UniProtKB/Swiss-Prot annotation:
Pathway(s): Energy metabolism; oxidative phosphorylation
Compartment list: Mitochondrion inner membrane
Subunit comment: Component of the cytochrome c oxidase (complex IV, CIV), a multisubunit enzyme composed of 14 subunits. The complex is composed of a catalytic core of 3 subunits MT-CO1, MT-CO2 and MT-CO3, encoded in the mitochondrial DNA, and 11 supernumerary subunits COX4I, COX5A, COX5B, COX6A, COX6B, COX6C, COX7A, COX7B, COX7C, COX8 and NDUFA4, which are encoded in the nuclear genome.
Transit peptide segment: 1-41
The family this protein is said to belong to: Belongs to the cytochrome c oxidase subunit 5A family.
Biological process (GO), any one: mitochondrial electron transport, cytochrome c to oxygen
Single GO molecular function: metal ion binding
Modification note: In response to mitochondrial stress, the precursor protein is ubiquitinated by the SIFI complex in the cytoplasm before mitochondrial import, leading to its degradation. Within the SIFI complex, UBR4 initiates ubiquitin chain that are further elongated or branched by KCMF1.
Protein name: Cytochrome c oxidase subunit 5A, mitochondrial
Physiological role: Component of the cytochrome c oxidase, the last enzyme in the mitochondrial electron transport chain which drives oxidative phosphorylation. The respiratory chain contains 3 multisubunit complexes succinate dehydrogenase (complex II, CII), ubiquinol-cytochrome c oxidoreductase (cytochrome b-c1 complex, complex III, CIII) and cytochrome c oxidase (complex IV, CIV), that cooperate to transfer electrons derived from NADH and succinate to molecular oxygen, creating an electrochemical gradient over the inner membrane that drives transmembrane transport and the ATP synthase.
Major site of localization recorded for this protein: mitochondrion
Cross-referenced InterPro entries: Cyt_c_oxidase_su5A/6, Cyt_c_oxidase_su5A/6_sf
Amino acid sequence: MLGAALRRCAVAATAWAGPRGLLHSAPTPGPAAAIHSVRCYSHGSSETDEEFDARWVTXFNKPDIDAWELRKGINTLVTYDLVPEPKIIDAALRACRRLNDFASTVRILEAVKDKAGPHKEIYPYVIQELRPTLNELGISTPEELGLDKV
């Protein structure tokens, strides 16, 4: 599928080339103009929110997850343009606890606060939803540790 998309992009790119291989600022009308409308992006299936959440919860709930996989998962999750659901964060915090990685728990909570951005109501909601887990695992929030004042 990727090969076909790359071929379409190559065809679209050659449609702009003139007789000497130079790029022209405006295409000439004709059959090549139809090729121009091809967009070069993936047409793969999209993942529902429930599938996305289940995939991340399953990954963090792996009993044999190691520190590298945990950090890789956290880094990947942070790159998305979203604030993870509390159930995903819960699974990540439990994975941190299984690995005795307190620093990652603080990093996760700081990342959630950062991802919430100007929406001040999101972070308190997430902490409220995670409060039972935080108490059960003995995890302090960055605010409780005084890290928000640094």
